[in-house]
Regions:
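Short, small-residue-biased leader/transition segments that mark boundaries at the very start
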Residues: 2-7
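AMP-binding/adenylate-forming catalytic core of the ANL superfamily
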Residues: 13, 17-115, 125, 130, ...
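General small-molecule cofactor/ligand-binding pocket signal
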Residues: 120-123
């Protein structure tokens, strides 16, 4: 019974929390005048950089070409009346200023200056669901201060042990009002 309640609550928060009473599934669609539907991409994998929408895949495509990076996850966080892009990466060697500069230059030249992350943190692992999806939205919720049990269903995670690192980063670097 308790498991059923947990599943129901998780289902509700996944699909009905963002727009009260409206099913929100995370895809952008276009409905034509002939009532045809065209899938245009994932809305939950979209960053909002001061009103400019950026697809995370644009940035991941560039990061995948940087040999020092094993894996990455990028989120946007609201800071006063602005937003910042926060990049988490697992690396093959220690993250230093040379790698950070390489990342910023590559993203700027292959995407745009608006795509460049403000903050870059090294983590041992990027969190994934059991089905292999990066957990961008739950990590964004955790970084913004939401409790883990409200942001993530650990049972749906491939690697829940990595969450402590993200909480530590939030508490150490991202908790001040100025961020």
């Amino acid at each position: 019974r308790q498991r059923q309640m947990c599943i129901r609550d998780s289902y509700h928060s996944s699909y009905f929390e963002k727009n009260k009473g409206v099913w929100t599934h995370g895809d952008w669609i276009y409905i034509s005048s002939e009532k045809g539907i065209l899938m245009q991409g994932r809305s939950d994998a979209t960053l909002n950089r001061n009103g400019i929408r950026i697809g995370t895949s644009e940035i991941y495509t560039v990061l995948d070409q940087i040999t020092e990076i094993k894996d990455s996850l990028i989120i946007d966080i609201a800071v006063q009346k602005s937003s910042k892009l926060v990049l988490f990466i697992s690396t093959k060697k220690t993250l230093d200023n040379e790698i950070k500069t390489k990342i910023k230059n590559a993203v700027k030249s292959k995407c745009s200056p608006r795509h460049v992350p403000n903050l870059i943190f090294s983590v041992s692992e990027i969190p994934y669901t059991i089905s292999g999806k990066k957990m961008e939205i739950p990590i964004k919720k955790i970084v913004n201060g939401q409790k883990i049990d409200q942001a993530i269903s650990k049972g749906a995670m491939k690697n829940p042990e990595c969450l402590k690192e993200y909480i530590d980063i939030r508490n150490q670097y991202l908790k001040s009002p100025d961020q």
